[in-house]
């Protein structure tokens, strides 16, 4: 008699397969809404992981397969490559150091020295050409620069009619 009065669920309602205490439906594989949502989420994560693994492996595997196929297609005839000798970098000579003393007074100038157009280094008081007796011809150099900057233009003669 106790068996007759036992609490049974109606035929349309079934408990969740995961035994969580909620009712499941046949549309959700007899899972409740919470368990079905968790199942869908796990399936999506597995699918995304599978696609990322396949995409990361495909670039690595494809060239290996192509190289292997290329080796099989080509018979044993291979070109021998000439080996180029390895060049050892030699130390390049350092640029010539600027003289760090004035040519006239031998005073140490360092970075404040002035290079004259005659090619020597001078201190602040001997930097002018008149003071150190420069041999450079500034007038002819100026004339040459002006001639290069302003070439002579000669127009073609017009014929008289």
From Swiss-Prot:
Record's signal peptide? none
Zn-finger (AN1-type) intervals are 96-142
Quick one: which residues bind Zn(2+) 2? Answer: 102, 105, 123, 126
Task: Give the SMART domains listed for this entry.
Answer: ZnF_A20 (SM00259), ZnF_AN1 (SM00154)
Q: Where is this region: Disordered?
A: 76-99
Q: Which residues bind Zn(2+) 3?
A: 116, 118, 132, 134
GO molecular function ontology, one term from the record = DNA binding
What Gene3D superfamilies does UniProt report for this protein, alphabetically? 1.20.5.4770, AN1-like Zinc finger
Query: Which keywords does this chain's UniProt record carry?
Result: Metal-binding, Zinc, Zinc-finger
ZnF A20-type residues are 10-44
- The residues that hold Zn(2+) 1 are 16, 20, 32, 35
Report the protein's function.
May be involved in environmental stress response.
Q: What is this protein called?
A: Zinc finger A20 and AN1 domain-containing stress-associated protein 4
């Amino acid at each position: 008699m106790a068996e007759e009065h036992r609490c049974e669920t109606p035929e349309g309602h079934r408990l969740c397969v995961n035994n969580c205490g909620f009712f499941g439906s046949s549309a959700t594989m007899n899972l409740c809404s919470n368990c079905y949502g968790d199942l869908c989420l796990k399936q999506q994560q597995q699918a995304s992981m599978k696609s990322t693994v396949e995409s990361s492996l495909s670039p690595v595997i494809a060239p290996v397969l192509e190289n292997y196929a290329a080796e099989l297609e080509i018979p044993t005839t291979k070109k021998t490559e000439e080996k180029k000798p390895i060049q050892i970098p030699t130390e390049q000579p350092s640029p010539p150091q600027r003289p760090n003393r004035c040519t006239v007074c031998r005073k140490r100038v360092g970075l404040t020295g002035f290079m004259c157009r005659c090619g020597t280094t001078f201190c602040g008081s001997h930097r002018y050409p008149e003071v150190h007796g420069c041999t450079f011809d500034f007038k002819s150099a100026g004339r040459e620069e002006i001639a290069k900057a302003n070439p002579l233009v000669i127009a073609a003669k017009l014929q008289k009619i």
